[in-house]
Amino acid sequence: MDREVRFNVLLEVLMAWHLFRLGRWSFVHRRLVAGAWAILFVVLGAGAATLAGQTNDNFELSGIESTEAFDLIQERSPQAAPDGASARVVFEAPEGQSLSDPDNKKVVDRAIADLTTDGVLSVADPFTAGTISEDGRVGYASVSYSSTVVDLPQSDKDALEDAAQAAEDAGLTVAVGGDALAGETALPIAELIGIAVAFVVLALTFGSLVAAGMPLLTAVVGVGIGVVSITLLTGFVELSSVTPALGTMLGLAVGIDYALFIMSRYQHEVRQGRTLEEAAGRAVGTAGSAVVFAGLTVIIALAGLSVTGIGFLTQMGLGGAFTVAISVLIALTLLPALLGFAGRRVTTGRLSFLKDRDPEGGSERTNGRRWVETTSRFRWPALVAGIALAAIASIPVASMQLALPDDASKPAGSDARVAYDLIADNFGAGANGPLIVVVDTQGADEPAAAVDAATTRLQEMAAQDGSDIAAVVPALTSDAPEAQEAFAQQLEALQLATITVVPGSGPSDQSTKELVADIRDAMADLPGETGARALVSGQTAVGVDIANELTDAFPVYLVVVVGMAVFLLIAVFRSIWVPVKAALGFLLSVGVSLGATVAVFQWGWLSSLLGLDTTSPVIFILPILLTGILFGLAMDYEVFLVTRMREAYVHGTPARQAVIDGFAHSARVVVAAAVIMMGVFAGFALTDDVILKTIGFALAVGVLADAFLVRMMIVPAFMAIVGDRIWWMPRWLERFVPNLDIEGERLASRLEADGATTA
């Protein structure tokens, strides 16, 4: 026997055999296993409670022009704290009054004084800064802090809230925007919705409340350990608030699903007459193998986000991957331990209104068997119809626009949204997201002339017909000699000047993005003419730059992640065409998901069902993040569904009949898993946080499309068309690819040879 063949046989035996031993050991030593997980949770929880820091929603990326502009300000004028927290306090006088009325002005002046705390760098008084509306009713004060959002002391937040409340009590309408009061993302409702849906589906699947509770319990423990670990990490690393939320979302979804597959196999083994101990071992050795490789595909897809080199995406990916890894370990160890505690109650005490049937019973005339028989019989129409439906649903993707989330997408009536709307209505939409043009005069022979040249170009752009520039605020706004002298001294010291450009459109509008490009084009030859350079920054510019970086990183990410996952699936299924078909089907799922997201969030179709009252571009991180997460989840369903088909095929069943038998065995459990995952994601789609809402909705639709349209319609139709060729693999490749025995065939043979007992 060749060395490669001997290695493959050894690996396939060790994989399933060790998982079998792990499951049986956890069942027998259940108190030790449960105690170890409980201690780990308590220790991590205590650490998180004492050492945790705060999260933030600032998407930052080094190496892009907009970030370089902020870094330049920070380097030469650190007291300006460009990365510090900020707030906009908007005041509105009652109908028929103005803010300049004596009583109202006193209220505003008092609020400005109250806002000036030790941690505040500056407060721009609306009366002196010119931020009073034409009718005099609305004005806003811009507050800049020396601390970042993460480090902002609670005392500064309290002072901001108290000042706003005092002005409100005095008769003004007051709203606070900006990031200074950005709070933590609240998730309890989202989690409860997912858990409620999961419990109902599990109860219907297993017919037992005890059995239904076990996957929920293990998933909650896995999520708890994953999230407290991430929370503990915030004490040492600055993380986005989406990172723990994403960990919660994925941990609940995959944690319940992985436990569901092992529980289903456990009940099946018990019905075959196994002892409870051996049934637990066999369930982990067989279904557990599928869970391991399904989990690996998700982990690869999420951890692979680090190849983009984009910090916040790397954080989200690694945080999600860690939680998924914990969920896999929990399913392989804590679940069999809990099965040991529950004993026969898992398979008895059924709900009276449900039939007593095997969750994996494939011989019955179930709806799943009827469906796959129909799909296989009419395979060409099913394949064409499935692909056509996915293609039609993907049409909106062609008009997808990406942008950073802003306060315009906050819930109606929230403080941040009220402040945004008041500013947009009274000062123009662009006032909510001005562009900052930073002029670096370090290489200029005449710095003042260079700044003037940059200002002149911007003013000429503003004067053109159809210009999207509402206003240009020069670095020097006064003609007074003393002001000019002070500016010259400052320019000589800092070698830096800032020009503010107020767009005529909002921060997330396409015209504002085009304006960023136009300004950069207009400034392209400034270095050659003056020796100075101009860098464009601001919220829209940051979004444009990050979107460009994501676009460049996306192909690399796809090649690395899809390549690794396809190789893993080749080893799992001993086939070239199954992984290729799985990857192509995944592209259809992504298209449907992104198409639906554009239709709802950008076009406004059925948006009221999600609590949206306005349309907005899709959040810029969604395409690559959705691709990573959904790819992993899609491969999950591919593994769980096609594993049973291959199991039937390797046992001698003809290829087309193997598709039917394998589908009938696994369809009920896969449907339950998909519905649970959709319920979890849909719960997050109902939150107020627009980032989580968008991700939750996109994932819910993606799972719906992948599980029901792709895996249960297109896949069986395609496999029925291809027949035996679907399992083809070149002989030379077989020598190098390990046979992982995910079906547990060699495990069963070894157990029978060892004389394993049955009840």
Give the location of each predicted region:
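A short glycine/threonine-centered beta-strand motif
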Residues: 91-93
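Membrane-embedded transmembrane helical bundles of large multi-pass transporters/channels
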Residues: 1-53, 121, 136, 144-402, ...
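Structured non-transmembrane domains adjacent to transmembrane bundles in polytopic membrane proteins
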Residues: 63-85, 95-177, 399-607, 617, ...
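Short coil/turn segments at secondary-structure boundaries
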Residues: 39, 86-87, 385-388, 435-438
